[in-house]
């Protein structure tokens, strides 16, 4: 009589395993596309988005960095003193009575936060001072705005939510500075997209915390020249990625190296 229960246990275990395996394969993260929130959106940068290059996140040429025209400047309420640089958002236009400038079907766009939209206290928040606190506002690259609304609208109500960033390749570390000052620009971050903590390790040092200088530029005042460098970064979803020996011992200032990215 004993073999029968063993067979039953095996069958049940197999069914349970099949049921949980898809969930087990998912990658944890805080931004799976949550509830929509309300904001407004305008545009800047010209039809080719060339005016969006540079910016308060430090990314420089958004084309070469892989961000392209899918970018936006965030108001104070969203920018979070630069900590939101690299975060990804899904945005869609919302028609309101007497204000119907959205494209049919209300298509959504995916953008990365790459710049800061400063407040203009000389103008009221509802008439020109669009980025004044506490307004959540997106100043979109012009091509992205035109994807969701008509040009003549100028400004439109939108719904937005945080979503995971999907990037090609690994996290990129661009090392600038000089012997006693290392300024590392962190770009192309998948997952949460925004980095809240960063550390560096040389071949002859332990892990050393880096401090945010501005945007996604992180600094260390240690002498690291001549050492292979490893980097450890943590996103706002509390996941951490370690890139061992991302930069070889012979690295030079101005070079960019690719490390391990977050899974999405």
Curated annotation (Swiss-Prot):
A GO-annotated cellular component: extracellular region
Every Expansin-like CBD domain range: 180-259
Gene3D superfamilies linked to this entry: Expansin, cellulose-binding-like domain, RlpA-like domain
Tissue specificity annotation: Expressed in panicles.
Pfam families: DPBB_1, Expansin_C
Alphabetized UniProt keyword annotations: Cell wall, Cell wall biogenesis/degradation, Disulfide bond, Membrane, Secreted, Signal
Disulfide bonds: 57-85, 88-165, 93-102
InterPro entries associated with the record: Expan_Lol_pI, Expansin, Expansin/allergen_DPBB_dom, Expansin_CBD, Expansin_CBD_sf, RlpA-like_DPBB, RlpA-like_sf
Expansin-like EG45 domain location: 54-170
Cell compartments where the protein resides: Secreted, Cell wall; Membrane
A biological process from GO: plant-type cell wall loosening
Membrane topology: Peripheral membrane protein
Induction summary: By gibberellin (GA3) and wounding.
PANTHER family in alphabetical order: EXPANSIN-A15
Record family assignment: Belongs to the expansin family. Expansin A subfamily.
Functional note: May cause loosening and extension of plant cell walls by disrupting non-covalent bonding between cellulose microfibrils and matrix glucans. No enzymatic activity has been found. May be required for rapid internodal elongation in deepwater rice during submergence.
Name under which the protein is recorded: Expansin-A7
Gene of this entry: EXPA7
């Amino acid at each position: 009589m004993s073999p029968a229960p063993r067979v039953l246990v095996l069958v049940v275990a197999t069914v349970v395993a099949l049921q949980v395996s898809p969930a087990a394969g998912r990658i944890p993260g805080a931004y799976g596309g949550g509830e929509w929130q309300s904001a407004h959106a305008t545009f800047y940068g010209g039809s080719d988005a060339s005016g969006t290059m540079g910016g308060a996140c430090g990314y420089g040429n958004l084309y070469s960095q892989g961000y392209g025209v899918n970018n936006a400047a965030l108001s104070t309420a969203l920018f979070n003193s630069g900590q939101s640089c690299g975060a990804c958002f899904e945005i869609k236009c919302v028609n309101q009575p007497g204000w119907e400038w959205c494209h049919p079907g209300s298509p959504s766009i995916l953008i990365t936060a790459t710049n800061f939209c400063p407040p203009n206290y000389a103008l009221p928040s509802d008439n020109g001072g669009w980025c004044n606190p506490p307004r959540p506002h997106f100043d979109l690259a012009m091509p992205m705005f035109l994807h969701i609304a008509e040009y003549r609208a100028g400004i439109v109500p939108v719904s937005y939510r945080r979503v995971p960033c999907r990037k090609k390749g690994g996290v990129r570390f661009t090392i600038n500075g000089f012997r006693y000052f290392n300024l590392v620009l962190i770009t192309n971050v998948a997952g949460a997209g925004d980095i809240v903590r960063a550390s560096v390790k040389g071949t002859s040092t332990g892990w050393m915390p880096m401090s945010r200088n501005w945007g996604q530029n992180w600094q260390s005042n240690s002498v690291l020249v001549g050492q292979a460098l490893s980097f450890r970064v943590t996103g706002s979803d509390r996941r951490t990625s370690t890139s061992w020996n991302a930069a070889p011992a012979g690295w030079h200032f101005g070079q960019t190296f690719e490390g391990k990215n977050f899974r999405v």
